[in-house]
Regions:
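Hydrophobic, aromatic-rich transmembrane alpha-helices
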Residues: 37-53, 155-168, 309-328, 367
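Alpha-helical transmembrane segments of multi-pass inner-membrane proteins
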Residues: 71, 75, 97-103, 107-137, ...
Length: 381
C-alpha cells in the first residue's frame, strides 16, 4: 500500500475502534470521533477518485447498486424517522463505507492481489477486535463478541470454499488460504457466539456443496439442523462455556426475544415505510424501558425500520449477491464468495448488521458484494 493512503487507513482504524470500543453514551466525544473519521474517509476517497459516486452506481453490478439504493432509501427515511438525524447518519454511513470499499478493491488489477488484500483486510479486522476486546473489555481466553466471531466465520467459509474449489492453487495461494482459515477457526473456537458458529457451519456446508464435496455438505447441514432442532444439545455446550446459562437465558438477558416481539408490534403500525433507518429498536427501547442498541435480526430490523419497501430492497441485495456468486461458481473466487455470503446471510438472524449500526460484519458483507463485481474484471495472474 502506497504511503499516500496511510491517513485513509488510519481514519478507518480509528472509526472501527470507535464502533467497537467507545460507547456513545455519556457525552458527544465518541459521536464526534465517528463523524470526523467517516467524513474524513469520504473526503480522502473523493480526493483519490473524483468520480467514485458515479462509478459505484453506474459502472458496477446490480449487487453494489442495490446496496447503494437500499441505503439511499434509508437516508430518505429520515424524513419520517423517529430520530431523523440518527437515521440519516447511519444510512449515509453505509453508503460511504461502500464507496470506500469500491475504491479500495478497485486499486488491484490481478485476482491474487485482490484476494490477498481482501483476506488480509478481514483477518486484520477480526484479530483487532478479538485482541482488543480481551485487553479492554474482558481479559479471558473465551469471549462472547459477535462481530469478531462473525467476520472470522465468513473468512473461514470463504477460505474453505476456495480450498475445495482448487482453482489457481499455487503454493503461495494455498498457504494464504490455509493460514487465514486456521486463524479464523482459532477466533471462532474461542468465541461463545452461537450465531457466529452456526453461521460458519452453514457457510462451510455451502462450500462443501459447491466445492465438490456434497456428502460432506449433507453431514454439515445435518449438524446445523440438529443444533437448531435439539436445543438441549446446544444448551449442553453452552453450559460448558457459559456455566449456568442456556440459549434461552442468554437471549433473554440481551432482550432479544422481548425486543423482537415489540419490533413486530411496531412494524404493524407502519408496515410500508417503517420508523426510519435504525430507529425501530430505539422506539422499542423507549416503550420497553430497556437498552436495545441492535435489533439482532436483519429481517426484523429492516422491516421495522424501512417497512416492506426496505425489506424487499434488502432481500433483493442478498438474493442478487447469492445469484451472481452461484452462476459464476466455476470461476476462481466465486465458490468462496458463495459460502461467505451464505454465512453472512445466516448471521443476519442473530445480528442486525444491515438494519442498523454498522460494524465489522457490515464491512465484510459489503466487501463480498463488491467482490462479486471485481472478481469478474481482474486478471488471473
Amino acid at each position: 500500500m502506497k504511503s499516500k493512503y496511510k491517513w485513509l487507513f488510519i481514519l478507518f482504524a480509528i472509526w472501527i475502534y470507535r464502533i467497537d470500543f467507545m460507547p456513545a453514551d455519556g457525552g458527544g466525544f465518541a459521536k464526534a470521533v465517528q463523524v470526523v473519521t467517516l467524513f474524513g474517509i469520504y473526503f480522502l476517497v473523493y480526493k483519490y477518485q473524483r468520480n467514485i459516486l458515479g462509478y459505484s452506481y453506474n459502472r458496477t453490478n446490480v449487487v453494489v447498486k442495490s446496496w447503494i439504493v437500499l441505503y439511499v432509501w434509508g437516508v430518505i427515511s429520515s424524513l419520517w424517522a423517529f430520530l431523523p438525524t440518527f437515521a440519516f447518519f447511519l444510512a449515509l454511513q453505509n453508503i460511504i463505507l461502500c464507496l470506500f470499499l469500491v475504491w479500495f478493491y478497485g486499486m488491484f488489477r490481478t485476482f491474487k492481489g485482490l484476494e490477498k488484500a481482501f483476506l488480509l483486510f478481514v483477518v486484520s479486522l477480526f484479530l483487532f477486535e478479538a485482541v482488543f476486546y480481551r485487553l479492554l473489555v474482558r481479559p479471558t481466553f473465551i469471549i462472547h463478541y459477535l462481530p469478531s466471531g462473525s467476520t472470522a466465520g465468513m473468512c473461514m467459509a470463504y477460505c474453505f470454499g476456495e480450498i475445495l474449489a482448487a482453482k489457481l492453487n499455487d503454493n503461495k495461494r494455498k498457504k494464504l488460504l490455509k493460514g487465514c482459515f486456521w486463524l479464523s477457526f482459532l477466533v471462532l473456537l474461542t468465541s461463545t457466539s452461537t450465531g457466529a458458529n452456526l453461521s460458519a457451519l452453514f457457510g462451510i456446508s455451502m462450500a462443501c456443496m459447491f466445492g465438490g464435496k456434497p456428502v460432506y455438505a449433507v453431514l454439515m447441514f445435518s449438524v446445523v439442523g440438529a443444533l437448531y432442532l435439539f436445543k438441549d444439545i446446544l444448551d449442553y455446550f453452552m453450559n460448558i462455556f457459559m456455566p449456568g446459562k442456556d440459549e434461552t437465558t442468554i437471549q433473554a438477558v440481551t432482550g432479544r426475544t422481548i425486543v423482537w416481539d415489540e419490533i413486530k408490534r411496531l412494524s404493524e403500525q407502519r408496515p410500508l415505510l417503517g420508523w426510519g433507518y435504525g430507529c425501530v429498536e430505539r422506539v422499542a427501547s423507549v416503550n420497553l424501558n430497556i437498552q436495545a442498541p441492535d435489533a439482532h435480526n436483519n429481517w426484523i430490523g429492516l422491516k421495522g425500520s424501512l417497512g416492506w419497501i426496505g425489506l424487499l430492497m434488502g432481500v433483493y441485495n442478498m438474493a442478487t449477491a447469492t445469484y451472481i456468486a452461484f452462476t459464476k461458481r466455476m470461476k476462481r473466487g466465486y465458490v468462496g464468495l458463495l459460502a461467505a455470503i451464505a454465512c453472512g446471510i445466516m448471521n443476519g438472524y442473530s445480528f442486525g448488521y444491515l438494519a442498523g449500526k454498522a460494524c465489522s460484519i457490515t464491512i465484510v458483507f459489503c466487501s463480498l458484494c463488491v467482490l462479486t463485481f471485481y472478481y469478474n474484471r481482474v486478471k488471473d495472474a
